[in-house]
Amino acid sequence: MRLSQMLFVTLRDDPADAEIPSHKLLLRAGYIRRIGSGLYAYLPLMWRVLQKVSQIVREEMNATGAQECLLPQLQPADLWKESGRWDTYTKAEGIMFSLIDRREQQLGLGPTHEEVITAIARDMIRSYRQLPLHLYQIQTKFRDEIRPRFGLMRGREFIMKDGYSFHTDEASLKETYQDMYKAYSNILRRSGLAFRAVEADSGAIGGSGSTEFMILAEAGEDEVLYTEDGKYAANVEKAVSLPIDAETSRFTTYEKRDTPGTETIEKVCQLLNCSPTQLVKNVLYQTVYDNGKTVLVLVSIRGDQEVNEVKLQNELTKLASEYGAKTIISLNVPNVEAQQAWTTKSLPLGYIAPDIADEYIAANKQIHSKFLRLVDQTAVDLKNFVTGANEAGYHVVSANWDEQFKLPERVVDIRKSRPGDRAIHNPEQTLQSARGIEAGHIFQLGTKYSQAMGATYTNEQGEEKPLLMGCFGVGVSRLAQAAVEQSYDNDGIIWPVAIAPYHAIVTIPNIKDAQQVEVAQKLYTELNQAGIETLLDDRDERAGVKFKDADLIGIPYRIVTGRAIANGKVEVVERATRKSQEIVIDEVTTTLQQWITAAIDVKN
């Protein structure tokens, strides 16, 4: 392609609304164009990158025996109501775009396709002889993000590969899960990316287990905790660990202490000269279920620990049926204004004890009359601890469970693991932290959707059984931007060779020099005929502008038909290393073929 004929406009300055390097560079280099909040046009260079990523994904999926298809983006609400996720996606998380058609039928723009594929399986799979089966698609998805940001990282429209598998038993499901683990590792490796596979929370998708594939980058939204022995890695939302040991309490006699102005852990520890590891803090949450029922949740946890709200939400979702509900609509720490809707009197915030009286909750049929009390294991293990006295300005010291306070019935793991914690598999290993961009996620769904939607098959004994399912997603457009976030410098993008829009760019420093133009045309033709995807910068611009643009767009190899042609050579510059060398004109094609093959093969 000739740049003079291409839609190619670069920017010298960073766009004001771009926050992270990859977003800035893709806009500046003319790869994408913002159309609206969270909405981007993929311009010609970007579309080539996306096609290459998609092809790698397609090859790896096909190699496992998965079959490509294409599912409708518009989905009937009735299918989502069958699975029980309509309210979760339109009210709780609120990420699904929903609409009503002219027949007054509710529809959703698909953020994911579990319901559609399960309905297809329900209608078409009859016998165990048809299983296992794995279908996938590469398609545009939609999410009504609260705050779209970071370009293609968190947009309202994005390209994704999503696959769904069906099985007769756990062994078959796990085999496909492992196949996908290998395939996803291959996809990222072939794309030239450094990544880490980590244990993950299954979120609204559900299922018994899942793994995320994190592209390592400082701008990543996710925190990954891992051990240096390589035996443990998890998203912080899912991570488990051993906290530091609690210090021995300095208190031996139970008593109430005057502690004015100590609403925070730090202040009470300073006043009482004690460690936060010897304090039980009690955090109040307000959760609303999909049937409108509000439940007040009191979480007791060791003073130096933080509540993992993803783990907490999972625990509360498990309890939904006890309140006549299916799922959670919202979970938050209620502010004073929110508390006024259900309290009979002001709460002693900062001084709440594990036994705060249920009488604080006003009588209301939409509000559960008692606090749901949960305790983290870190608090259960404490002796002679400090905690609130249910009275503003006072704490108690040397308290114990089953003496001064009844231990809550529900003991749960809801603490947030953090760097420095000890690993469970080997306490001598401590957790390290890294930032990551989630590029892929694989799930073992089990029968979550098949049971809810009546998708069954007949086994060898003639019995009707629910299908076991797996679900596997790769963010194609996110992966492409993540590659930029992982590899750039002050001058622009450094694309991995395998997914670069073009392998090489031939730059003519002076288009008025007939010899430069002739050599450039010759190389441009030869390289493309040899399968080396090549751009020709034949614009009437200064050489410096062309060199800067070549660096900005990140094409792996730049060939310059400058002064060296007098000696039968051209200058070839490798973008990643900036190494420059002069190569005989007739040897350029074979040399680049070798370099490109080596760069791609090293990732396979």
Curated annotation (Swiss-Prot):
GO terms for molecular function: aminoacyl-tRNA deacylase activity; ATP binding; proline-tRNA ligase activity. The keyword Cell membrane does not apply. Its EC number is 6.1.1.15. It comes from the Bacteria. Belongs to the class-II aminoacyl-tRNA synthetase family. ProS type 1 subfamily. GO terms for cellular component: cytosol. It catalyses: tRNA(Pro) + L-proline + ATP = L-prolyl-tRNA(Pro) + AMP + diphosphate. Its main location: cytoplasm. Consists of three domains: the N-terminal catalytic domain, the editing domain and the C-terminal anticodon-binding domain. It is found in: Cytoplasm. Homodimer. The gene is proS. This is Proline--tRNA ligase. InterPro entries: aa-tRNA-synt_IIb, aa-tRNA-synth_II, aa-tRNA-synth_II/BPL/LPL, Anticodon-bd, Anticodon-bd_dom_sf, Cro/C1-type_HTH, Pro-tRNA-ligase_IIa, Pro-tRNA-synth_IIa_bac-type. Catalyzes the attachment of proline to tRNA(Pro) in a two-step reaction: proline is first activated by ATP to form Pro-AMP and then transferred to the acceptor end of tRNA(Pro). As ProRS can inadvertently accommodate and process non-cognate amino acids such as alanine and cysteine, to avoid such errors it has two additional distinct editing activities against alanine. One activity is designated as 'pretransfer' editing and involves the tRNA(Pro)-independent hydrolysis of activated Ala-AMP. One of its GO terms (biological process) is prolyl-tRNA aminoacylation. Keywords: Aminoacyl-tRNA synthetase, ATP-binding, Cytoplasm, Ligase, Nucleotide-binding, Protein biosynthesis.
